[in-house]
Amino acid sequence: APSIAFAALRYKFKANQISLRILAMADKQEKPQNVFDFDYSKDGGDRPPQEFYDRIKEKFSEERDLRLGFRPPGTDSYTSDLSGELAKYAEDPHSHEVEDREPLHDAVEVLFIGGGFSALLTSARLREKGVESIRIVERGADVGGTWYWNRYPGVACDVVAYDYLPLLDETGYVPSRHYAGGEEIYEYCKKIAERFDLYDLAVFGTTVTSTVWDEESETWVVKTDRGDEMRARFVICANGTLSKPKLAKIDGIEKFAGHSFHTSRWDYEYTGAELENLADKRVAIIGTGASAVQAIPELAKAAKELYVFQRTPSSIDVRDDWETDPEWAATLEPGWQARRRQRAIEGPQVPDAVKARRAAMSKEEKVQRQENANIDAMMRIHKRIDEVVEDASTAESLKPWYMLMCKRPCFHNEYLPSFNRANVTLVDTNGEGVKEITEAGPKFDGVQYEVDLLIYATGFEVQQTGIYNHIIGESGLDLNVKYENGIRTLLGIHSQGYPNLFIMGGYQAFFAFNLTDVLNSQGEHIAECIDFARKNAIHSLDCTNEAEEAWVQEVISHRGKTTRNRDCTPGYYNFEGAENRRQDGNYNGTMKDYLTHMSSIREHMSDNFLFTRR
């Protein structure tokens, strides 16, 4: 096989053409071309020979194996048990905003564990159904979920705001930018809570410790770390799957004599509101994932010195951002977001001729064309790095060698240029990661990096079940114990043996890059189920074994069609490289398919659920 360099030479003309198109699109504020814009059914005669793609795939595998050689597959190289000497990394810097209160021993109709978009969306739908008794139990000091916790400099959403921010039709709000910043999103979350009167019964600074089904009263007993013992007819797990900060297991974390924190617990008291206190500080940040990509440009501008410790680079694409045109906003008619969402679900119209070509392809050819288009997109990202980053060695280190979507793709216009600054140093650990921290700071490959501030951009624990407390259902069975032999749900929302319990954002549900689309659909479904129970004098509903098994098999039938996740470099999308059961993942049909299943299940409630009446 030819070397990558030789193959890339033959690829140069094609890459230049793509790059020029991308720049033109960016100038016109149009969405840049990416892998999802490629039609893999086209002949692709202007693409490189197949041997080029095969060699790139070999390189991807080499990079994956290199990283797995440094650590075991799975999450053992991280810890989310932030207690003892690590407790400070989980402390809420805004906890002073929580008022003291007496323990609660009351009852509500609907109780949410978590106060992010899952709870806000579903509560809005429940209000529309006339449900008045709604309580949000949130460990933070306010609603907002991830946008409450993540307030690091530069934080913003990487999904178009007109799609990501939910309930725009209902609130009449129009985002200020194409991509909304974190502060705007957080304020919008509070606006939703006010609009739907969700603060009245909410409790903050409170962590649920157990949720137990009382078979005699057929209600859930919810206990918290504040001494509460509340009862609820319906409980909705809305705590999110990326809400618990984690740290890499690095020897000596506790030895560091300087200041340190996790990105999701940003200490503005130390850095200053505008990072002005960092002007004379040497700063290190460990991690180059989505949070780091947004924070690093701001740190680069403010810090005296910045060391960026990288294990695996993120893919960085163009961020086509702009302020919302007020004239365009004034033309929006009621229902505009719902129509926009429906168009996205329906997808583009595919000509019959293209459908016919796709239908005639073998599975192997389809996979190959998809992979080749994916590699085309990644090589364009590589070319952009070469164009932006001045130092050739740094540019090579910043190139991601994996398929797009192996890791969360990032979009930023200032991240790559940050490495052209004289005060910024990239410390590429080449897949190994930082292994030691001393009193002075990180130490890698025999080099001691003396710093004043150490920031951990090491991400969050991925909770497969969508729950964090002990949920005890019928017959005293802990939900986590039930899942030991594989996750079992209906739609990723219901689990047999746990009546009136709903799980949001967990596995076996559909996954979309715009997560709020999924949460909105789940919220509508949950509100419909609760409304059905209330209107039909049903006290509790629980999915049947048959319905649950049918959904598990549906999930399995859509998994394992490719080896993409297995072939990826370790990351939270593939359980850090660990082998996982075929049912322990997302539903890989389409969003439209998922909604169709939801609708069908609601149309046949008596076939899919067991009811009790009191």
Give short role names for the model-derived ranges.
Residues 204-218, 426-441:
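A conserved short coil-to-beta-strand element within the FAD-binding core of flavoproteins
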Residues 76, 80-99, 165-175, 181-185, ...:
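Glycine-rich dinucleotide-binding loop and its adjacent helix/turn
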Residues 100-107, 111-112, 117-143, 150, ...:
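Rossmann-like dinucleotide-binding core of oxidoreductases
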Residues 176-242:
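Feature captures the FAD/FMN-dependent oxidoreductase FAD-binding
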Residues 20-22, 26-109, 187, 246-267:
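Extreme N-terminal leader/targeting segments of oxidoreductases
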Residues 225-234, 279, 445-453:
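Core beta-strand elements of the Rossmann-like FAD/NAD(P) dinucleotide-binding domain
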